[in-house]
């Protein structure tokens, strides 16, 4: 059963910049709560960069108390080392909400684009424009935060339709 107000954390995984966006769903109304980026030092040791992402994302969850989380699935890069590092950042994006007992959903980039813009191959500018239309009070300054809000919007749209949500992978039981 969905809480009266469902607060959703969207995450755009990245090793240097992990975007996050929070929306609230009340009935059919979707409202902007907050957004931002958790940064890690691009020159630091990998373990410390991952720790920075973990601490930053945990702080977002503590501050905004979302009920559920959703993450953009990452694509495979041509550079195996970059792919591995991004995968480790993605692991942080998955485990931090799970440690807070949030259910975590994952969505492909094309599904996010299609849900937000109607076009699964939309450009970043089109996604940003639709996020601003759907969440007029949003002030996401970075592309990473905009992408995270698009993830949260996608989860909210699919959350309204439980049959569609069941066809997507939900990880964890949540609160």
UniProtKB/Swiss-Prot annotation:
Its EC number is 3.1.21.10. Homodimer which binds Holliday junction (HJ) DNA. The HJ becomes 2-fold symmetrical on binding to RuvC with unstacked arms; it has a different conformation from HJ DNA in complex with RuvA. In the full resolvosome a probable DNA-RuvA(4)-RuvB(12)-RuvC(2) complex forms which resolves the HJ. The lineage of its organism: Bacteria, Pseudomonadati, Pseudomonadota, Alphaproteobacteria, Hyphomicrobiales. GO terms for molecular function: crossover junction DNA endonuclease activity; DNA binding; magnesium ion binding. PANTHER family: CROSSOVER JUNCTION ENDODEOXYRIBONUCLEASE RUVC. It is an enzyme of class 3 (hydrolase). It catalyses: Endonucleolytic cleavage at a junction such as a reciprocal single-stranded crossover between two homologous DNA duplexes (Holliday junction). The keyword Glycoprotein does not apply. GO terms for biological process: DNA recombination; DNA repair. Pfam families: RuvC. Its cofactor is Mg(2+). This is Crossover junction endodeoxyribonuclease RuvC. GO terms for cellular component: cytoplasm; Holliday junction resolvase complex. It is found in: Cytoplasm.
């Amino acid at each position: 059963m969905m809480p009266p107000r469902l607060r959703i954390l969207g995450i755009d995984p990245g090793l240097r910049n992990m975007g996050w966006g929070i929306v609230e769903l009340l009935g059919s109304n979707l409202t902007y709560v907050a957004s931002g980026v958790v940064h890690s030092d691009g020159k630091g040791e990998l373990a410390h960069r991952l720790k920075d992402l973990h601490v930053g994302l945990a702080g977002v969850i503590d501050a905004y108390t979302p009920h559920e989380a959703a993450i953009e699935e990452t694509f495979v890069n041509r550079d195996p080392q970059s792919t591995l590092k991004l995968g480790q950042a993605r692991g942080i994006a998955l485990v931090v909400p799970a440690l807070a007992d949030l259910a975590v959903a994952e969505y492909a980039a094309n599904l996010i684009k299609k849900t937000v813009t109607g076009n699964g191959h939309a450009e970043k500018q089109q996604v940003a424009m639709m996020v601003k239309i759907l969440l007029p009070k949003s002030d996401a300054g970075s592309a990473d935060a905009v992408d995270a809000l698009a993830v949260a919007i996608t989860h909210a749209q699919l959350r309204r339709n439980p049959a569609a949500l069941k066809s997507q992978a939900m990880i964890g039981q949540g609160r």
